[in-house]
């Protein structure tokens, strides 16, 4: 991934893409058209019901539900694996059920959970953060989408788990605090499973009829089948073509691929992102270490964003305009 780059788009190129990047977000009166489409895609009555509620009514309803994860000194919570869905040759969706089917996760936007596993021969437990892809207000369970890495002890353990086994969780781990209309335009540069915290924010925006934030996504993967959550992203892009645009990059594109290949480059970012001087924008970055190094520079620690370097610095963005997950 991110080895070479040529950007060939089937959409109107050049000036049309630049226009999208620079124009203000339209102000539609409602997100209702999305609700039905996503409800059908999800196949759940609750999924549809909760989108018909006003944000205030939904918030009040959620306050009445018990939360599985409350942070602080709560400690680890063991959840049972209830289902496994194979998404590709090395990616699976794992559903973990809550002890109480009416409880919700207690996560907020944007936040993650820690997972813990200690094998019989391990001296120390393996602890890794994951961002659930299920709704924060979904009662009864949470879903993780996990790619198995050859030398990844937690991802390998998850892929070897059987239904009925348990995994320890802890959280929520706060990331970027999101509020509706906090920014006029957000831009997301993601690689591989780095899409999961991005999708958490994207979903929150388009589930809220009062949030008019515009979203641009640049998403790199190795192959087309590695593009996680593509179905959900397509629904959003088709429903909100003036508020959500996704640009995909593949290291190994199939025949007939019409979008980008290889590296995220300065040329691409200059074309699809709003100019640095644009007011009230935010750029989010999440992906493998090589992508951080090239695009934004790495974080110093989970709580220290580090200095802004790489392509975004070269293009003139400042540190306050960028957040690294």
Curated annotation (Swiss-Prot):
The keyword Plastid does not apply. It comes from the Eukaryota. It catalyses: 2 Fe(III)-[cytochrome b5] + NADH = 2 Fe(II)-[cytochrome b5] + NAD(+) + H(+). Disulfide bonds: none annotated. Its EC number is 1.6.2.2. Its cofactor is FAD. GO terms for cellular component: mitochondrial outer membrane. GO terms for biological process: ergosterol biosynthetic process. The chain crosses the membrane at residues 32-48. Keywords: FAD, Flavoprotein, Membrane, Mitochondrion, Mitochondrion outer membrane, NAD, Oxidoreductase, Transmembrane, Transmembrane helix. Belongs to the flavoprotein pyridine nucleotide cytochrome reductase family. May mediate the reduction of outer membrane cytochrome b5. PANTHER family: NADH-CYTOCHROME B5 REDUCTASE, NADH-CYTOCHROME B5 REDUCTASE 2. This is NADH-cytochrome b5 reductase 2. It comes from Coccidioides immitis (strain RS). The lineage of its organism: Eukaryota, Fungi, Dikarya, Ascomycota, Pezizomycotina.
């Amino acid at each position: 991934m991110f080895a070479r780059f040529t950007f060939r788009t089937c959409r109107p190129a050049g000036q049309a893409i630049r226009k999208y990047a620079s124009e203000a977000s339209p102000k539609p009166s409602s997100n209702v058209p999305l609700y039905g489409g996503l409800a059908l895609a999800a196949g759940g009555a609750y999924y549809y019901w909760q989108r018909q509620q006003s944000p205030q009514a939904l918030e009040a309803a959620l306050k009445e539900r018990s939360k599985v994860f409350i942070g602080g000194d709560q400690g680890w919570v063991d959840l049972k694996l209830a289902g496994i869905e194979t998404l590709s040759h090395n990616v699976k969706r794992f559903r973990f059920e809550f002890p109480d089917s009416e409880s919700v996760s207690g996560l907020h936007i944007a936040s993650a959970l820690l997972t813990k596993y200690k094998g019989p021969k391990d001296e120390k437990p393996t602890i890794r953060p994951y961002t659930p892809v299920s709704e924060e207000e979904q009662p009864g369970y949470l879903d993780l989408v996990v790619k198995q890495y050859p030398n990844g002890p937690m991802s390998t353990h998850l892929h070897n788990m059987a239904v009925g086994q348990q995994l320890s969780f802890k959280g929520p781990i706060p990331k970027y605090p999101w509020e509706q209309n906090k920014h006029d335009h957000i831009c997301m540069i993601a690689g591989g499973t780095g899409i999961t915290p991005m999708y958490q924010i994207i979903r929150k925006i388009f589930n809220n009829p009062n949030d008019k934030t515009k979203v641009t996504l640049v998403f790199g993967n190795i192959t087309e089948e590695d593009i996680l959550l593509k179905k959900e992203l397509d629904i959003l892009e088709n429903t909100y073509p003036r508020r959500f645009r996704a640009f995909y990059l593949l290291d190994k594109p199939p025949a007939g691929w019409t979008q980008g290949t290889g590296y995220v480059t300065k040329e691409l970012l200059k074309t699809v992102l709003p100019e640095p001087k644009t007011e009230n924008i935010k750029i989010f970055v999440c992906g493998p270490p090589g992508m951080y190094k090239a695009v934004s520079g790495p974080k110093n620690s989970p709580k220290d964003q580090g200095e802004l370097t790489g392509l975004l610095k070269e293009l003139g963005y400042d540190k306050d305009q960028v957040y690294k997950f």
